[in-house]
């Protein structure tokens, strides 16, 4: 239709709206990809179309062969799609809204599991930290600089000759002790484990030996084992379409789980191959399909290619759950397919240190969220090249409000740790990391809601404000967290001239000051505009009126117990509500009722807030807080009572004992 806009397809480049473009699905290693490179790492053949009236529908083309989509590129009024081979098997998902489609798509393809809380913290990485000494030094510097951090990532150079499931004992002589010592600092270790097993007969390399004995490696049409060149040199590849091979793969993680490694990173799983002109396996490589969910048969790589990376993460995830059944598994993947969110978080791959890539990062993250992958991030600052200081700082600011926050850079590029551009840049970056940690109760609540509903954490404006994609306002760098926090950056993040920030119609509050803002009504759409002048130290963030936002005192790690009350910030407005959610952050106990959920509402009229109500608590988890601090924004002074007893006001807020049975806080204007 003329006013239709198209979203989804995972990590495709080209901006948020797919209208007028065409794409190919074929998982591809795309180092340093450009703003219009296609295909890249993932194949998620699902799109959502949204019309002028805010109505929406979705289509999933469940075909794993090389496929294509045309959204008005050849013919302006037509959507076309197809594939080289395979079934014409597609699902049409009704709305009426974008959110309805997204949730039903998650119901169809599977919900992402609730991640460990530490996966929402700040994460430091480099290709590569070359030694145990360097890892310890990075951890010590992060703590000395007071940069809240939850993860340090280990890229391939921790391994012996780039062989998966090994450790270079020359450079990492005390690997298990290092992992333990990081944990005492509140920092988890996440280690890369690629799927290419070194072709090393007779060398005592256990993954090769056990995989060969179990007949777990792919073969060519003539029956010979397929060998490709990747990081270890000659390598063989697991038969992830075989349930037995997946179980075997999962057992290989046991020593690392025993050593305390908290998560694993499946890279290069498009799969990427160095010595093939197509940069992947030949199409005639054979895959044995032997799994409870499919009839047994043999398929060619041309059919399996787009799901191979997802099956790799399935094997990893299932293996970790089997090794530690009461712990949540964390897997990061580069390649995947529709439904891969059941097994892994993802990132947008080997991006570049440019302002255009920062713009692209927001669109890719939002479209991945609409495609099921709620846990998505980008390499902060860009993987390829070196970011100028201002770009790195701005990237930190945006990433503080995106689901996965990882600073990662390539070998041979300038170092990109947050302190490297001097104290002024570091202070800004630290401030935004701290802001994220203060928001952790809110972020973690969004994560829990995603596991239940499929609602993404980071959302385009159309998700919660239908019709906002039909307007003249440039919202390229705008998105929301849970429909409650609106990040409204300049359309070109490097610009220094003023711009009109577009806020959906209604009342909003400045997150940084708590003050209500009054946008100018727009004649072109359901927006008001605020004219803002960019500042390097300020990313504009607004809170939707009617929000009750849970926050926490600052910590240096999510494993640290916050010192002080839970904070509830009330931003008066219609349908005023919020939710408090908590659990232990790492185990499966929440599935057995070991969680806490409490609804919070407020009643307001023209004169202000009359009361805040905490409903009786659900679940059986004792939280870290024993008190609550309530702050009412909007510039009105109040007195407060609970059960007729006055609550003292201090520094603009009211602190009272935790209320697991529920309570009503009565408020009167002074």
Q: Where does each model-flagged region fall?
A:
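Active-site mouth loops of central-metabolism enzymes
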Residues: 122-133, 236-245
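Aromatic- and carboxylate-enriched substrate-binding clefts and catalytic-loop regions
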Residues: 148-429, 464-466, 475, 481, ...
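Catalytic core of carbohydrate-active enzymes
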Residues: 317-331, 335-347, 360-364, 368-378, ...
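A residue-level signal for conserved active-site and pocket-lining positions in enzyme catalytic cores
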Residues: 46, 105, 142, 182, ...
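Short alpha-helical segments and helix-capping/turn motifs at coil-helix boundaries
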Residues: 26-34, 39-45, 49, 106, ...
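Surface-exposed interaction regions enriched in Ser/Thr/Asp/Glu
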Residues: 660-670
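Catalytic and substrate-binding clefts that recognize carbohydrates or anionic sugar/phosphate headgroups
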Residues: 1-116, 126-127, 132, 139-144, ...
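Glycine-rich, histidine-containing beta strand-loop boundary motifs that form or position
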Residues: 11, 48-50, 60-63, 71-72, ...
């Amino acid at each position: 239709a003329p006013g239709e806009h198209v979203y989804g397809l995972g990590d495709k480049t080209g901006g948020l709206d797919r209208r007028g473009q065409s794409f190919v699905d074929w998982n591809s290693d795309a180092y340093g990809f450009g703003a219009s490179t296609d295909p890249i790492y993932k194949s998620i053949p699902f799109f959502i179309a949204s019309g002028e009236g805010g109505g929406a529908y979705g289509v999933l083309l469940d075909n794993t062969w090389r496929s294509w989509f045309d959204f008005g590129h050849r013919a302006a009024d037509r959507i076309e799609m197809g594939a080289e081979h395979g079934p014409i098997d597609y699902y049409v998902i009704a709305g009426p809204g974008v959110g309805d489609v997204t949730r039903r798509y998650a119901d169809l393809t599977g919900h992402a599991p609730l991640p460990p809380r530490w996966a929402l913290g700040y994460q430091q990485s480099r290709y590569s930290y070359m030694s145990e000494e360097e890892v310890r030094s990075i951890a010590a510097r992060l703590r000395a600089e007071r940069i809240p951090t939850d993860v340090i990532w280990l890229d391939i150079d921790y391994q012996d000759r780039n062989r998966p499931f090994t450790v270079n004992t020359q450079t990492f002589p005390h690997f298990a002790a290092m992992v333990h010592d990081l944990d005492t600092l509140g920092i988890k270790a996440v280690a890369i484990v690629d799927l290419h097993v070194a072709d090393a007969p007779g060398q005592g390399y256990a993954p090769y030996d056990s995989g060969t004995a179990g007949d777990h490696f792919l073969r060519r049409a003539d029956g010979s084992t397929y060998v490709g060149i990747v990081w270890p040199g000659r390598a063989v590849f697991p038969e992830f379409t075989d349930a037995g091979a997946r179980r075997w793969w999962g057992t290989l993680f046991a020593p690392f789980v025993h050593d305390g490694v908290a998560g694993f990173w499946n890279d290069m799983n498009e799969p990427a191959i160095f010595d093939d002109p197509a940069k992947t396996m030949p199409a005639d490589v054979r895959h044995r399909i032997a799994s409870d969910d499919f009839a047994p048969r043999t398929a060619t790589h041309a059919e399996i290619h787009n799901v191979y990376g997802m099956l790799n993460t399935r094997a990893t995830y299932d293996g970790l759950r089997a090794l530690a059944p009461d712990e949540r598994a964390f897997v990061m993947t580069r390649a995947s397919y529709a439904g891969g969110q059941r097994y892994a978080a993802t990132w947008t791959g080997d991006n570049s240190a440019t302002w255009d890539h920062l713009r692209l990062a927001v669109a890719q993250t939002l479209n991945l969220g609409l495609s099921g992958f709620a846990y998505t991030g980008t390499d902060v600052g860009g993987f390829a090249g070196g970011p100028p200081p201002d770009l790195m700082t701005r990237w930190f600011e945006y990433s503080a409000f995106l689901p996965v926050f990882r600073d990662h850079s390539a070998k041979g590029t300038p170092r990109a740790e947050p302190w490297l551009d001097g104290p002024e840049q570091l202070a800004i970056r630290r401030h935004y990391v701290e802001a994220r940690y203060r928001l952790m109760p809110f972020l973690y609540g969004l994560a829990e809601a995603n596991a239940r509903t499929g609602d993404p954490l980071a959302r385009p404006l159309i998700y919660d404000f239908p019709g906002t994609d039909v307007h003249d306002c440039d919202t390229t760098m705008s998105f929301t967290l849970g429909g409650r926090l609106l990040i409204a950056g300049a359309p070109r993040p490097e610009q220094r001239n003023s711009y009109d920030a577009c806020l959906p119609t209604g009342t909003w509050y400045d997150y940084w000051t708590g003050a209500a803002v009054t946008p100018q009504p727009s004649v072109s759409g359901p927006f008001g505009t605020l004219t803002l002048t960019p500042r390097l130290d300020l990313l504009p963030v607004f809170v939707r009126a009617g929000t009750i936002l849970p926050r926490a005192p600052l910590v240096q790690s999510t494993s640290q117990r916050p010192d002080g009350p839970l904070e509830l910030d009330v931003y008066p407005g219609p349908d005023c509500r919020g939710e408090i959610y908590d659990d232990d952050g790492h185990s499966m106990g929440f599935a057995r009722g070991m969680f806490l959920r409490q609804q919070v509402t407020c009643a307001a009229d023209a004169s202000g807030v009359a009361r805040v109500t905490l409903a009786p608590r659900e679940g059986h988890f004792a939280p870290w807080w024993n008190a609550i601090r309530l702050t009412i924004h909007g510039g009105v002074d109040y007195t407060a009572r609970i059960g007729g007893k006055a609550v003292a006001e201090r520094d603009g807020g009211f602190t009272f004992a935790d209320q697991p049975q529920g309570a009503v806080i009565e408020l009167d204007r002074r």
